[in-house]
Amino acid sequence: MKHLLSVCDMDNVVDLLDLADDYKEGKIREKILRGKTLAMIFEKSSTRTRVSFEVGAFQMGAQPLYLSASDLQLGRGEPIADTARTLSRYVDGIMIRAISHSDVVELAGEASVPVINGLTDLEHPCQALADMQTIREKLGGFDGRLVFVGDGNNVCHSLLLITATLGMDMDVACPPGYEPDPGIREMAGKIADETGSRIRVIHDPSEAVRGADVVYTDVWVSMGYEDEAEDRLEVFRPYQVNMELMELAAPEAIFMHCLPAVRGQETTAEVIDGPHSVVWDQAENRLHAQKAIMHWLMGDI
């Protein structure tokens, strides 16, 4: 049974990108998922993940089924394994946006239908695929260098893995103590060694961004870290992606953000709404990338 829990589960990244492009260009009109149902479990609120999966499944002929934590018996103590086995009797695929990555791994271990990680505390593979689709269409390939500025979080983890897989150099500019997970760094480093790319973690954002082709940031206070908000806002202040920082990047550099954004914190309105920004194309590509993922996992190919 194929699942997408991590970027490392994509043994066909370029094929998926090509498929996503085909969906974006309207080359695939057949209802690949006609008669199928996708369960969408959300332990965290969502705009882009929910809407893109729901619209994408519908456009592919499937019936999306939204399930919040309060809709399921998980909140009342039903084991994850029991939920996985039960849903597998009803639906053809499960997309889950969860708090704990280990819960998603357990769910996939017991499910008899494909499970898609729609975001956990460790990874966000769907976002990473859409990001690479965006980079390829804007830059023409992966010869440039991506710099992630801010918290070494789940989005950063998936970007490290997918850029390494595609042979793209990536730097992470973050405060001491907010580096990416050591296990993810080690895994990405091994992949990078095989593909000839380079990964660095740097604490000086100016040094990291100088000459970069892609500058990427994310919120400083992710869901679940609200109690650290005051400390984080102070620690990350020097890591704001503003025009002064963007001017250090390559002249044709693009600015990316997985959204939602807090203008005035991790970036400024001048940047996110300015000429370098591709965030709306990036958000749109969530739809096309996730169609490719559903096609791959649920399309009987």
From Swiss-Prot:
InterPro entries documented for this protein: Asp/Orn_carbamoyltranf_P-bd, Asp/Orn_carbamoylTrfase, Asp/Orn_carbamoylTrfase_sf, Asp_carbamoyltransf_Asp/Orn-bd, Orn/put_carbamltrans, OTCase_ArgI
Reactions catalysed, as given in the entry: carbamoyl phosphate + L-ornithine = L-citrulline + phosphate + H(+)
Biological process annotations from GO: arginine biosynthetic process via ornithine; citrulline biosynthetic process; L-arginine biosynthetic process
Location in or out of the cell: Cytoplasm
Pfam families listed in its UniProt record: OTCace, OTCace_N
Keywords of the record: Amino-acid biosynthesis, Arginine biosynthesis, Cytoplasm, Transferase
GO molecular function (one): ornithine carbamoyltransferase activity
Any one of the GO CC terms: cytoplasm
Residues reported to bind carbamoyl phosphate: 46-49, 73, 97, 124-127, 258-259, 286
Top-level taxon: Archaea
Pathway involvement of the protein, from the record: Amino-acid biosynthesis; L-arginine biosynthesis; L-arginine from L-ornithine and carbamoyl phosphate: step 1/3
The enzyme's E.C. designation: 2.1.3.3
Binding site for L-ornithine: 154, 218, 222-223
Family the UniProt entry places it in: Belongs to the aspartate/ornithine carbamoyltransferase superfamily. OTCase family.
PANTHER family linked to this entry: ORNITHINE CARBAMOYLTRANSFERASE, MITOCHONDRIAL, ORNITHINE TRANSCARBAMYLASE, MITOCHONDRIAL
Role, per record: Reversibly catalyzes the transfer of the carbamoyl group from carbamoyl phosphate (CP) to the N(epsilon) atom of ornithine (ORN) to produce L-citrulline.
Protein's name in the database: Ornithine carbamoyltransferase
Source species of the chain: Methanothermobacter thermautotrophicus (strain ATCC 29096 / DSM 1053 / JCM 10044 / NBRC 100330 / Delta H)
Gene that this polypeptide is encoded by: argF
